[in-house]
């Protein structure tokens, strides 16, 4: 269950019988991007192995503070393609809807770790603005649900969004 996910670096290290020397850097780096590891994923990791490949996907490390030349916090160049909150429109005939910033697991290599999810919540007025934008742009044929993980959206809310999008005649595909 998502609610029982490990979010504390100390708890992760203890559960995996890993040395406390990893704790300071894990706590510091988790301030940059939070730790989130579902128990089902954690249970597949090898106890006592700091080089476990699954652990390396989720363990915050000090290297996350390195500023590498040529790297950017917006690797997909989405900041200039957000015409209204929650909508990313980079390609002529398709747009992304950012349904949620939440994921079941926070991978350290996440390309959207710096995405301003709090400014892109698709609720209330933002949802109405997103719908208006999608209706106005008749070149759009496809809407792609994205996030975080769009499937953490409640069934009721997701169904309502799909129904609203199905009412836009020029949209042919939802994925």
Where does each model-flagged region fall?
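Conserved Radical SAM active-site core
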Residues: 59, 69-98, 108-175
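Flexible, acidic/Gly-rich N-terminal and inter-domain linker regions that tether
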Residues: 1-90
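Short pre-active-site segment immediately N-terminal to redox-active cysteine/selenocysteine motifs
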Residues: 102-106
